[in-house]
């Protein structure tokens, strides 16, 4: 429990339209000036170093959630290190991440081949930091093969495009890493919306435009939203993601705009834990990733 507590992030969900107390007037600094001091995602990834038996990286403060890397970034870094240590992997099909402790300080990421079959490859990947083991993950890669089955039950939300939706990341004291993303609320509710269902559909994109078909970039973006359960919150509260499981539905997703639609729905929230599902949609209406998440909520 000590490690979980150390990795908590306090979501202060007061809207910017409310009067700002003097202690947080720094949020009045122009956004362009803030971004000029930030580390682009591509620069962050390029800074990963190869060691004898692992890859290492140190995170700047603008990529943190409180004092630790947020789950999506940790997942993306594990995938990047796995690719660097294993050439010619087929597309990622599924991954399971357990966030054991805070990802702080100099991070070391080691990937180990678990099994290589004719079409699928399983890799185990651990991330350690100053506090010990931070992330334990299993990644499954699989080559495409002919199939007589083609079925989909997922239905894309009928929402307006990002240009016609209001800004999403407009809270005071939101996590530092959120400034790396542009968000537009397409449906559902903002956190701390009294009486609303705990669900949201938000258009997301990296401010650092790059190869938007990269699964590493997509994982970092797919976990950028706060838990949907925080729609029900009445006060700011610390949260900590415990586990994150993803299934990749499109081996090579296409995206010409940079925008992805994240549809997050809280299934249950009780006894201090929330379970939710998130679906990531491409701009042309294809589901590319489904994720399940268990979150500890301290409040």
Language-model features: where?
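Short hydrophobic targeting helices and cationic amphipathic motifs
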Residues: 13-16, 34
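Terminal targeting signals and extreme-terminal segments of soluble enzymes
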Residues: 33-299
